[in-house]
Amino acid sequence: MNPTRYARICEMLARRQPDLTVCMEQVHKPHNVSAIIRTADAVGVHEVHAVWPGSRMRTMASAAAGSNSWVQVKTHRTIGDAVAHLKGQGMQILATHLSDNAVDFREIDYTRPTCILMGQEKTGITQEALALADQDIIIPMIGMVQSLNVSVASALILYEAQRQRQNAGMYLRENSMLPEAEQQRLLFEGGYPVLAKVAKRKGLPYPHVNQQGEIEADADWWATMQAAG
């Protein structure tokens, strides 16, 4: 990988916000899933979460994985599992839902560890999910339409989170908050995508990428990579 590419990936890693995420509860249209993931990447989200029960899990996970190779998609079989995982990371759970207790999405402090919960396109967030959320939020609507597309709504909220975090200097870190192993994975997959595919296919561990963006691997690793099959 050339120095420019290495520097760009390192800059991206330093700006990643591991304590900001989105959870999609049965969002089932691939174009919406893809759009949400692209926006998540644009504001520095490292990992998004999705609840896809039963047989839809594999299909939707595959569609999501193809949306953006820089954003991880963690799937959960139930919303209870997802929320328990996220609250275990100290995140506030915000549900996009009109209720008597809902507040304008811009009134929330997004510099706190935050998960934005988005519901299924037609039916919205389930009652089970609403009961688990910490706060309902709304996007004010002053026209004739009553709702926005789920990917549009998530984009508005994510960019408010990005605005607040940028003002707080949370994108100015010199070092990434991601674990070293995760940084190495992204450096190799992003800097050497062809080699990464071969290594995956052959079941080889990823090599170390040094501070010059160069691969550090022994002769046996290279020999296995170059062998036919």
Curated annotation (Swiss-Prot):
<dbReference type="GO" id="GO:0030488">
    <property type="term" value="P:tRNA methylation"/>
</dbReference>
<protein>
    <recommendedName>
        <fullName>tRNA (guanosine(18)-2'-O)-methyltransferase</fullName>
        <ecNumber>2.1.1.34</ecNumber>
    </recommendedName>
</protein>
<dbReference type="GO" id="GO:0000049">
    <property type="term" value="F:tRNA binding"/>
</dbReference>
<feature type="binding site">
    <location>
        <position position="148"/>
    </location>
    <ligand>
        <name>S-adenosyl-L-methionine</name>
    </ligand>
</feature>
<keyword id="KW-0694">RNA-binding</keyword>
<keyword id="KW-0489">Methyltransferase</keyword>
<dbReference type="InterPro" id="IPR029026">
    <property type="entry name" value="tRNA_m1G_MTases_N"/>
</dbReference>
<keyword id="KW-0819">tRNA processing</keyword>
<comment type="similarity">
    <text>Belongs to the class IV-like SAM-binding methyltransferase superfamily. RNA methyltransferase TrmH family.</text>
</comment>
<dbReference type="InterPro" id="IPR022724">
    <property type="entry name" value="rRNA_MeTrfase_SpoU_C"/>
</dbReference>
<keyword id="KW-0808">Transferase</keyword>
<keyword id="KW-0949">S-adenosyl-L-methionine</keyword>
<feature type="binding site">
    <location>
        <position position="139"/>
    </location>
    <ligand>
        <name>S-adenosyl-L-methionine</name>
    </ligand>
</feature>
<dbReference type="Pfam" id="PF12105">
    <property type="entry name" value="SpoU_methylas_C"/>
</dbReference>
<dbReference type="InterPro" id="IPR001537">
    <property type="entry name" value="SpoU_MeTrfase"/>
</dbReference>
<dbReference type="GO" id="GO:0002938">
    <property type="term" value="P:tRNA guanine ribose methylation"/>
</dbReference>
<dbReference type="GO" id="GO:0141100">
    <property type="term" value="F:tRNA (guanine(18)-2'-O)-methyltransferase activity"/>
</dbReference>
<comment type="function">
    <text>Catalyzes the 2'-O methylation of guanosine at position 18 in tRNA. Type II methylase, which methylates only a subset of tRNA species.</text>
</comment>
<dbReference type="InterPro" id="IPR033671">
    <property type="entry name" value="TrmH"/>
</dbReference>
<keyword id="KW-0820">tRNA-binding</keyword>
<feature type="binding site">
    <location>
        <position position="96"/>
    </location>
    <ligand>
        <name>S-adenosyl-L-methionine</name>
    </ligand>
</feature>
<dbReference type="InterPro" id="IPR029028">
    <property type="entry name" value="Alpha/beta_knot_MTases"/>
</dbReference>
<dbReference type="Pfam" id="PF00588">
    <property type="entry name" value="SpoU_methylase"/>
</dbReference>
